[in-house]
Amino acid sequence: MDNTEEADPGAYFDSYEDLKIHELMLSDEPRQTAYQNAILGNRQLFAGKTVLDVGAGTGILSLFCAQAGARKVYAVEASNLAHLARAVVKENNFEQVIEVSECKVEEFRLPNDERADIIVSEWMGFFLLHEGMLDSVLYARDKFLKPNGLMFPNTATIYIAPCSVPSRFDRWENLSGVSMKCFGRALREQCSSKPEVLTVASEHLLHEGHVMTWLDLKEVTSEELNSIEAKEVLVAQREGKLQGFCIWFDCTFPAAESDEQMSSEVILSTNPSAPETHWKQTVILLPEQACEELEARDPVAFSLTMTRNQETNRRYDLQLTLLDAETEEHNLPCECQMTKCILMKAHLDTMQVDG
């Protein structure tokens, strides 16, 4: 992604004083609904508990927690938006429950060395980690969360899949009866220097999605997030044009358990098949010479590395490399149509029958 932003930690928080950003997030219905259902659908987890909201923004998640019966909610917001959050809290008559602090969570202190039962945060960035604030949430977890405390969300998964990108390729072949291939080519060259945030239709995915990484937010460390790598041979599940790779994420929330019932798990998904969110999907476009027509069961070999930017640690650099499916090791059994995999699958099937 673009790394031209100065390595100024204050600039990150200042950007969140733009109310248009918060209008976008508050208008994101899947995002709002997931947090509301996860919190208000688990009132038994919040009733009488102490909650820490990291990066509280307008305070809406803190209000959900108060509505769910939390005894005390500490809403920490590093930007001047904290003043508006206080007004929103007052407007909803929760001043006795929600306390808003204008500071970074790294500078925050809970009174009397109190510990939080639950940490709530909407920290996710593009492809989960880019321009997000997970490091601050993990700091809060280690500093303030009780040993048996809960994280909302509590897990996160990054997926990757080969895809077609007709909006960047096919549409320029005939635009209102005019060939604009040269424009499309120039546009792709301009865009290929960094990943793009796009809406990808589910029918343009050539694979259902491979898990690049899964994070347990009670256990993962900031150091483990410095670099994440996937090296895979995926098998195309439908025919189509390989023009890029699509990245998205899911987050899950804890579900309460009791003798009477177990509340259903809430998932916030940015999968192309799910309702669109403001995160959309992240797409790495391939150079034109690397694009190819795929048949179902064709193998696609690649490696992708997400590396924390050295100058701005909230940003991540992506490095995609196409590999030779002939020489790369395939998962077993492999469903691709390469001869070696067909023979190996037949051999494994024979062994199972004999067994």
Regions found by a protein language model. Give the residues of each.
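Class I SAM-binding transferase module
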Residues: 1-54, 58-355
